[in-house]
Amino acid sequence: MARDYPLELYRNFGIMAHIDAGKTTTTERILYYTGKSHKIGEVHDGAATMDWMEQEQERGITITSAATTTFWERTEDGKTPLSPKHRFNIIDTPGHVDFTIEVERSLAVLDGAVCLLDANAGVEPQTETVWRQADRYKVPRIVFVNKMDKIGADFFNCVKMIKDRTGATPAPIALPIGAEDKLEGIIDLVTMQEWVYQGEDLGASWIIKDVRDELKAEAEEWRGKLIELAVEQDDEAMEAYLEGNEPDVPTLRKLIRKGCLAMAFVPVTAGSAFKNKGVQPVLNSVIDYLPSPLDVPAYMGFAPGDETETRNIARSADDSQPFAALAFKIMNDPFVGSLTFTRLYSGVLKKGDQMVNSTKGKRERVGRMMMMHAINREEIDEAFAGDIIALAGLKETTTGDTLCDPANQVVLETMTFPEPVIEIAVEPKTKADQEKMGLALARLAAEDPSFRVETDFESGQTIMKGMGELHLDILVDRMKREFKVEANIGAPQVAYRETISREAEIDYTHKKQTGGTGQFARVKLVITPTEPGEGYSFESKIVGGAVPKEYIPGVEKGIKSVMDSGPLAGFPVIDFRVALIDGAFHDVDSSVLAFEIASRAAMREGLKKAGAKLLEPIMKVEVVTPEEYTGGIIGDLTSRRGMVQGQDTRGNANVINAFVPLANMFGYINTLRSMSSGRAVFTMHFDHYDAVPQNISDEIQKKYA
């Protein structure tokens, strides 16, 4: 069966933003206008189509990225199609900091993005985080300044904030007509026409007319700026413009597209999804300015087993190339079981095909294939390059794995996942719960790589580790609801780390003589601190065979066994390197095990000698508050060992930026609510590890001794 839609009509894009910028509402409107959803779901009612987990509907936030396929043809009057029908594969991503990992996963497989801003708040902390992630994956984007109906909405302040906070060049392609309760519609700067919405019904009707006289001067000024940015993308257009010839509308659109794809600037439009104003122009802009899979460079991968990971195998959006795809999300579906969301980069995949998970070197078979619309699914028999589909029943595949043609193997991107910063102990209430809990935690960990499960060997407790309090709350909640596990939950604990403060040299000999074959190994190690974030490395500087090659893996194994449990309080040791510079062996009594024991003892001694110190996670905190509470909030942050970095204003609110140890931020939301009568809000995310003051370090060591 041939493909229904040529690749140039595909748009794989995500909707990204800060929490509460109206992302799910905007996606709901898009699904409504593109005809996939006949009743608009409001987040306030807990009925939004994309938010399909129970917890999402209760909390009114989006936790997991749901993928949806829908269709749109460019229109200006809402009736006449001005382009062929385009196929949109949309990924709705969460805006809460604890779920940054979901955003990371979806950006890795998208070609473009629509970034939403709250017209009142502008570029917020999570917007900056997501923006940086999108920069890293080189994802072209357009900006929709949403909530223009809100009190304090300021489009031009948002445009300024894009420039100041992200460093990108904003290029408004539309201006709002009015704001707050006077919002009427937008001025399209490309065509110089007004879109005036009639009432606030489902945006079904609007009038297109010439720009009214009182708005003309401002619109022409902004159009001039847009044209200047656009003609910079093409020498001929620039020459013509300098000779006094402005580009016509189709040429201007092509130039804006070129600039957007090159990430030279970011097209910006405006509206209010909740009031059904300005969403159709966003859909038109997705067609006009965001890339199709053909506009994106070939995806480079490396051959399985290539330790240098030299990326010299290209896979581009072409059905005739060998099949290659990336699994970017695992989801547990109540009816189908495990679903693996997959982006096809090249080739064709048919039901029943054999494929290889090249990341793990395991074979998989294609069972059921589905096109997803939030929680509804449509069974399909084949998928093509550029498609985003869900595969049911894969046994070995987890997030970030490559699936490919067995005869033409390649490993595509491997995603990087952050280390958890917070942990809680969970204990099942009954024996039956214990068995269910093991299964539940394994499932949840397969779905979410930023969530880890470990067993504390000393206490025998199960430890859940995650990215924040909300993250772990929701996982515990899912364990209870989806897997019916009853468990007792401990108080949250900080994931401390240990490191060293100076270089140390250790010469250690391990000897054991008990009749028969003995054990003998001598190692001389140098332990050196590295820059924060550099991690651990090992190097053998042995020359002349003082320690034979076959024993060196034993040395490294011994070192690694000590890294998991540092000398101060048993936390993992980070940011150091070890060099093996000398040693000795015995022809009969030496073995890999003897060298492992020797290096383990040498490391224990060496870490103490190198001045071990305790590190704690430091969070970047932003508090937005009415001015009258500023003094009290700053005082409270300082009392939590916080370092206030500065203040700013946003609209009529004050913005306080600070670095605060995570250990002092538990339950902060309740304190902030009572201090500000519920009017202040805060966001925080992990920034770096820093040394714990000695008096607090002593307390922690006593607690964990």
Curated annotation (Swiss-Prot):
Entry binding sites for GTP: 17-24, 92-96, 146-149
Compartment(s) where it occurs, according to its Swiss-Prot or TrEMBL record: Cytoplasm
UniProt keyword annotation of Cytoplasm present: yes
GO function term, MF aspect, one: GTPase activity
GO cellular component: a single term: cytoplasm
SMART domains: EFG_C, EFG_IV
Similarity comment: Belongs to the TRAFAC class translation factor GTPase superfamily. Classic translation factor GTPase family. EF-G/EF-2 subfamily.
Biological function: Catalyzes the GTP-dependent ribosomal translocation step during translation elongation. During this step, the ribosome changes from the pre-translocational (PRE) to the post-translocational (POST) state as the newly formed A-site-bound peptidyl-tRNA and P-site-bound deacylated tRNA move to the P and E sites, respectively. Catalyzes the coordinated movement of the two tRNA molecules, the mRNA and conformational changes in the ribosome.
Protein name: Elongation factor G
Originating gene: fusA
